[in-house]
A protein has these predicted regions:
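Extracellular glycoside hydrolase catalytic/binding regions
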Residues: 4-120, 124-128, 133-160
Length: 162
């Protein structure tokens, strides 16, 4: 379960996200083995706020979202410093808007960082939309599976790193 996906705007950890999570978690616990992923403010990047006042429950992980063309060393340091179990539930090889080219060097830094720390991840996005972060070429036919010749530069990088 991922609750509070990318909270943003005037949302705070202490007054919005954490109280909501503490209300929803007991309901989810009907499935006693469920891992619950909780986002933090600023599009799941304020892990330092969650670290100051973590949720007191079992099987909780905190999500982080990043884009290689926008989020660099400062966010990696924030993750390293937070001391929380982290799952990267969204990341892309592009800038945060999904475009701006593919930043393979920075994406590799992120892959290395996550691998060194045993951080699991999900990439954005498995689609054929005409944007840098898309894994599939525009018009790709995926009815019979995905072939390498239907992958974008981003898609090839991501699939290589699974």
């Amino acid at each position: 379960y991922e609750i509070c996906n990318e909270p943003n705007g005037n949302v705070t950890w202490n007054y919005n996200v954490k109280p909501y999570a503490e209300t929803v978690i007991p309901v989810i616990r009907a499935n006693t083995n469920a891992i619950i992923l909780v986002g933090s403010p600023t599009w799941s990047q304020d892990l330092h706020e969650a670290a100051k006042n973590p949720i007191n429950a079992e099987n909780i992980m905190y999500t982080c979202h990043f884009y290689a063309g926008t989020h660099t060393d400062w966010l990696r340091q924030r993750i390293a410093d937070c001391g929380l179990p982290v799952f990267v539930s969204e990341w892309g090889t592009s800038a945060a808007d999904g475009n701006g080219g593919v930043y393979l060097d920075e994406a590799q830094r992120w892959i290395d960082f996550m691998n060194e720390r045993g951080i699991s991840w999900a990439n954005w996005s498995l689609c054929d939309k005409n944007e840098s972060s898309a894994a599939l070429l525009n018009g790709a036919n995926v009815n019979d599976g995905i072939s390498e010749d239907e992958l974008t530069e981003s898609g090839k990088f991501v699939f290589k790193n699974f």
